[in-house]
């Protein structure tokens, strides 16, 4: 790390995607850990949820029973159950998977404490929300336990928490008063994602939206509240792109401190030219075999293979644009090479299509065809196949352009391809990621790293990064200007990109592929890590400035370890600071009874005390009672009398 920056001696990193692939955050942390290994070694500690504890062995995790076994035994005495080992990614970083289910019976107590202490509004939170709160809470306890067992108070310790799902860990650490510098990184905003996913104009109309009101409208108040309080209470608040920083600055109660763009480690790509050629040939062969089995027609060796991958966010990820663009080429007078388009988007399914598998194994009917490789759980409600029907995309035998939906995670064991996503990606000729909402955009970056030309948009963080950090011609990537009102222009641009790739000469194609790889290097961790270093350094500086608050703990790191009380909430703080007139004592009782949350009359009552304070408090009656002047309460008491 740069000499003029404070370097952490220990870095804890908490995410729902540690050893648990859901989206791009998995790649962020996995690749960054490899880069940081030489600097932090075993002092870079990753914490994730033990979501595989009741199922088969986690393919991403290898437990090491010998690692820190004394501490593990000590932590178990305070109810912390965890598995310690290595993440099965390059570099094999230390990973701790925590079991948060033993705290289920404490859920209400924990939520009440966060409400009283920080104003986190969890009333509307469903089980997924509560599960996330418990995970972050236990992750915070793990960091506290490790600190008290191993550290002296002299070390510089940073804990980075990714996304709102881990934010309760920040609140826990702040509550227990350890000298641990906290960084909160959001890879999107709750409200921004909701607006974009519900076809509302996020970018043109952003300033007109009230984040709290929109959160209530979309029933994500709990998520938004935790996200807001996490940003507010962290030492340093970061996000992954300038476009998402704009969201954060508007919807959350704090400005972003540092923009920390994501990076990539090219160790994930073939190490030699020979390996690259072998992997590309194997991928193309498999893609052509499956396409032939699904369509019922052989696929030519020089066919153009196009793809899109990522989460099933139909509009946000530009899946709608992808389908419409392919259809635009299909219905035009295009007479070039065969084009086979693969939509590799995981969705709910009930396993591989058995007739397709039989056909691939040479046992099934040669006449069987399908557009979907796996049995969809609710095909009648699926938007991708629904759009196929609307546009008449049926992979007709005489059509030179065909489309396939692959709704399974490509983890090497999907039942049809039985190859991992990267091992198939390398065989494509073009990827399209025409996103509407894409805070960063790992998928086009991954595509470039594997030498596959791609398309993204100006609304993707990575697209903006290319525009500002690669100042040469870049035929390997097209960045399409996208806004709230030019959908058809984006479809046309994507269709033109397909035609372009289909018509280039072999020599031009090689130039595109070489440029793709070159562009990807601007986002290597060796170039991007500086922004994370800044965030860690600033967090340490902020923590140092508050060291007086931590002096007692620093001198006696294990003091009070056995005396932490976790069984019951205390209302002492409100009882000793509030002096309500006798006629209004009922407000005290009502504010602590969750009944007010769903009673409109009760809400109106608290609002009437002081509408401005009610709004600024996020509709928190405890804050209202603490904030409003005694003069105002006396006025209300006289009215009540």
Describe the role of every protein-language-model region.
Residues 563, 579-619, 628-632:
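A short, well-structured beta->alpha microelement
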């Amino acid at each position: 790390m740069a000499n003029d920056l404070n370097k952490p001696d220990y870095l804890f990193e908490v995410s729902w995607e540690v050893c648990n692939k859901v989206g791009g955050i998995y790649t962020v942390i996995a690749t960054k850990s490899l880069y940081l290994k030489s600097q932090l070694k075993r002092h870079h500690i990753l914490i994730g949820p033990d979501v595989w504890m009741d199922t088969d062995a986690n393919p991403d995790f290898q437990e090491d029973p010998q690692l820190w076994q004394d501490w593990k035994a000590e932590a178990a005495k305070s109810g912390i159950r965890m598995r310690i080992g290595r993440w099965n990614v390059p570099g094999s970083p230390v990973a701790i998977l925590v079991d948060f289910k033993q705290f289920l019976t404490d859920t209400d107590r924990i939520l009440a404490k966060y409400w009283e202490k920080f104003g986190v509004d969890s009333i509307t939170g469903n089980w997924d929300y509560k599960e996330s709160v418990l995970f972050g809470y236990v992750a915070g306890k793990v960091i506290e336990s490790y600190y008290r067992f191993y550290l002296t108070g002299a070390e510089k310790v940073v804990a980075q928490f990714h996304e709102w799902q881990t934010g309760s860990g920040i609140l826990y650490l702040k509550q227990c008063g350890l000298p641990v510098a906290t960084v909160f990184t959001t890879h999107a905003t709750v409200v921004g994602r909701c607006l974009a996913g519900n076809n509302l104009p996020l970018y043109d109309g952003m300033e007109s939206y009230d984040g709290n009101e929109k959160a209530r409208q979309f029933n994500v108040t709990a998520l938004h509240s935790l996200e807001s309080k996490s940003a507010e209470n962290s030492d340093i608040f970061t996000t992954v792109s300038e476009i998402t920083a704009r969201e954060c600055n508007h919807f959350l109660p704090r400005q972003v401190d540092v923009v920390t763009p994501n990076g990539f480690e090219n160790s994930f790509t073939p190490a030699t030219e020979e390996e690259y050629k072998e992997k590309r040939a194997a991928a193309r062969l498999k893609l052509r075999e499956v396409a032939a089995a699904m369509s019922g027609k052989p696929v030519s060796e020089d066919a153009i293979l196009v793809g899109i991958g990522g989460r099933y966010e139909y509009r946000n990820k530009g899946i709608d644009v992808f389908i419409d663009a392919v259809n635009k080429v299909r219905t035009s007078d295009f007479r070039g090479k065969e084009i086979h388009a693969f939509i590799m988007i995981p969705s709910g399914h009930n396993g591989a299509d058995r007739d397709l598998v039989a056909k691939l194994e040479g046992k099934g009917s040669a006449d069987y065809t399908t557009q979907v490789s796996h049995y969809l759980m609710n095909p009648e409600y699926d938007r991708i196949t629904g759009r196929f029907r609307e546009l008449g995309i049926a992979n007709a035998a005489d059509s030179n352009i065909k489309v396939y939906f692959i709704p399974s995670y490509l983890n090497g064991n999907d039942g049809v391809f039985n190859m991992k996503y990267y091992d198939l990606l390398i065989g494509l000729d073009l990827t399209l990621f025409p996103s509407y909402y894409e805070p960063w955009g790992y998928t086009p970056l991954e595509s470039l790293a594997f030498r596959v030309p791609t398309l993204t948009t100006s609304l993707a963080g990575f697209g903006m990064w290319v525009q500002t950090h690669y100042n040469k011609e870049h035929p390997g990537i097209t960045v399409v200007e996208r806004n709230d009102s030019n959908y058809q222009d984006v479809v046309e641009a994507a269709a033109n990109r397909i035609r372009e790739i289909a018509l280039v000469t072999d020599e031009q194609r090689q130039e595109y592929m070489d440029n793709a790889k070159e562009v990807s290097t601007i986002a290597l961790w060796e170039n991007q890590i500086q922004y994370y270093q800044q965030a860690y350094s600033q967090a340490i500086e902020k923590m140092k400035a508050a060291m007086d608050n931590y002096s007692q703990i620093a001198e006696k790191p294990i003091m009070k370890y056995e005396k932490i009380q976790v069984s019951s909430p205390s209302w002492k703080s409100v009882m000793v600071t509030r002096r309500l007139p006798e006629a209004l004592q009922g407000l005290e009782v009502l504010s602590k009874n969750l009944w007010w949350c769903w009673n409109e009359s009760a809400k109106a009552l608290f609002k009437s005390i002081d509408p401005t304070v009610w709004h600024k408090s996020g509709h928190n009656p405890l804050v209202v009672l603490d904030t409003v002047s005694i003069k105002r309460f006396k006025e209300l008491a006289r009215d009540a009398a």
